[in-house]
Amino acid sequence: MIHFVKNIPIDENVPENYKEIVFGAGCFWGVERKFWDLPGVFLTSVGYSGGDIENPSYEDVCYRDTNHAEVVKVTYDSNVINLMDLLKIFWECHDPTQGMRQGNDIGTQYRSVIYTNNDDDLKVALKSKDIYQKELVKNNFKTDSLESITTEIEPVKNYYLAEEYHQQYLAKNPNGYCGIGGTGCSFPKL
C-alpha cells in the first residue's frame, strides 16, 4: 500500500529516531488531512485502535461492538516538529467535549483519543489536556462541567491499519465528507 500524498509505502520502515502517536478525533479522513503535509511528519495512516478484537474491518468497527476508535497514526521527526505542536493541532481540529461523537458522526468509533508509545509522551499528552481544558474554561466554552474534556489518553493498546480506500481519502476525494470541527478555542502558545 502506497501513501497517496507522500508516495512511499505506508508500512515503510520508520527511521530509528522518529516517534509515533495515535490520534482519534472523529472521522479519520479529516483528521489525517490535518497532519500529512506538516513539516517533520514522515508518514500518516488511518486505522482502528483501542478495541477488543484483532484485525477489525470498517464494517466491524461501525456495525459491531468492537470498541475501536477511528484513528490516525502520525510518524514524525521530533527534531523538526515536537509532540506539543502535534497536540495543538489535535486539540484545535475537533471538539474534545462531545464524548462518543464528533458533530453529526455518532458512535464510539468517533470518540476523542490520544494513544502514546511511552510514558514521557503520555505525560505530555495529559499536560496538554489540562492546558486546553483551562483554555476552554477561560473562553467560556459551553460545556457540561469544568472537567468537560472526554478525550481518552492512555498507552496504545493496538493499531490495525484501515482498508486502502480509507488511506488519504480526502487527497483522493478532495470534495469528500469531512465532519470534524473545532471549538473555536486556540491552544495557547507556551
Placement of each model-derived feature along the sequence:
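Flexible coil/turn and secondary-structure edge motifs
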Residues: M1-L190
